[in-house]
UniProtKB/Swiss-Prot annotation:
This is Uridine kinase. GO terms for cellular component: cytoplasm. Signal peptide: none annotated. Gene3D superfamilies: P-loop containing nucleotide triphosphate hydrolases. It catalyses: uridine + ATP = UMP + ADP + H(+); cytidine + ATP = CMP + ADP + H(+). Pathway: Pyrimidine metabolism; CTP biosynthesis via salvage pathway; CTP from cytidine: step 1/3; Pyrimidine metabolism; UMP biosynthesis via salvage pathway; UMP from uridine: step 1/1. NCBIfam families: PRK05480.1 (NF004018), udk (TIGR00235). InterPro entries: P-loop_NTPase, PRK/URK, Uridine_kinase, Uridine_kinase-like. Belongs to the uridine kinase family. Keywords: ATP-binding, Cytoplasm, Kinase, Nucleotide-binding, Transferase.
Length: 213
């Protein structure tokens, strides 16, 4: 019998594809009956504290090497064992980790949301359900400009990063995540049906996990 007390649901997809929106919709439904939390993959960027601001700005944050996979896997494993972890917080202005952390756990369901949440094989093996959210490149770019503008970025730098890192990394790494996804959801403004189905499916997966009979 699996010794883990919780289950992991991973939601992946390109930058600004709607992953966070869908993760939050599922969370709002599940929280009424289970202990659940969203764990953003972005929180597990490497800290790069020994690099200058100019060096940190030059990092390709859309490449798998930008993430601290070992820490992420360790935290997920502990959460699924029913433990509490101190989740790092990411500072988007200074391109590093914040000093403060957030404690989460114990949980029934962990929702891991990010660009390529099951890229690491250790994490892929922990997943009970892998969901890929798909949106057109044009739609994702428009949302990216809107989002990063609100974070204090200028449009020229946003488009430059999109051309040099975001778009090519999507083609090389992120899009390939679809091959191992259990479910692919095309983005639309209305997701009530799909999220309600996922709510039912995830609850069923958890109940089956804790009581296989």
């Amino acid at each position: 019998m699996d010794s883990k007390k919780g289950i992991l649901v991973a939601i992946g997809g390109g930058s600004c594809s709607g992953k966070t929106t869908i993760a939050d919709m599922i969370y709002q439904l599940l929280r009424k009956k289970l202990k659940v939390a969203i764990l953003p993959q972005d929180n597990y960027y490497k800290p790069y504290k020994n690099k200058s601001m100019a060096q940190r700005k030059a990092i390709n944050f859309d490449h798998p090497d930008a993430f601290d996979w070992k820490l992420l896997w360790s935290h997920l494993d502990n959460l699924l064992m029913g433990k509490t972890v101190a989740v790092p917080m990411y500072d988007y202005v200074n391109y590093t980790r914040k000093k403060e952390t957030i404690e989460i756990g114990p949980l029934n369901v962990v929702i891991l949301e990010g660009l390529m949440p099951w890229f690491d094989e250790r994490i892929a093996k922990l997943c009970k359900l892998k969901i890929f959210v798909e949106a057109t490149g044009e739609e994702r770019l428009i949302r990216r400009i809107e989002r990063d503008w609100e974070r204090g970025r200028d449009v020229a730098s946003i488009i430059k990063q999109w051309r040099e890192a975001v778009s090519p990394m999507y083609e090389i790494f992120v899009e390939k995540m679809k091959q191992k996804a259990d479910l692919i959801i095309p983005w639309s403004e209305r997701h009530e049906v799909s999220t309600n189905v996922l709510d039912f499916a995830i609850e069923h997966l958890f109940r089956k996990h804790v009581d296989p009979n």
